[in-house]
Amino acid sequence: SSAASDVYKRQIKLKEFRSYHPDFISVTYGAGGSTRENTHELASYIQNDLGIEAMAHLTCVSHTRLEIETLLEQFHQSGIENLMALRGDPPSGKNHFQRPSRGFAYAVELIESIRALNGFCIGAAGYPEGHVENPDKEADLKHQKAKVDVGAELLVSQFFLVNEFFLKWRDRLHRGGVRIPII
């Protein structure tokens, strides 16, 4: 099948990463523009077959809390210890994110739930220029600190072009008491 062929091609490409000795490889949710199953499959391949730490992304989009718990158990059973907990973008065709029925509205809720299960290392998104949906930058910083307070162990910065934005954001987080790695 075409999907199996695509996964195989990705695995061949991923083998090339070993020579760079990365600390970890981040695997987006719905890896390769497909379903969430590829995230688990590729993260497991990276972790178990290549021997490189994998950080699997997990989002709140379209999941109940029970579905999230099932996904967490699958990651745990596969030896995946590192997760990037994200709210996620609105589903295709939607302008705004809406809490799924019996699901999570915010990444902080997802992080808190993950922290209660299986001892995962949890990464969270950081926004040097502020989150696009929150014009209040101070409130935005408080939201990022809240992720740390409930269990995030590192912040992974969103893309930025001006280093000054990142450095000021990092310094404001430090002044606010955030003492975890910021990548």
Feature-to-residue mapping (PLM):
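Short, small-residue-biased leader/transition segments that mark boundaries at the very start
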Residues: 2-8
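Glycine-rich, proline-tolerant flexible connector loops at the mouths of alpha/beta enzymes
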Residues: 22-40, 90-102, 153-169
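Conserved, mostly hydrophobic/aromatic
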Residues: 25, 75, 147, 151
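Alpha-helix-loop-beta-strand connector modules within alpha/beta enzyme cores
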Residues: 36-56, 102-124, 167-183
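Glycine-rich anion/phosphate-binding loops
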Residues: 60-74, 101-105
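Active-site/ligand-binding-proximal alpha/beta "capping" segment
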Residues: 112-155
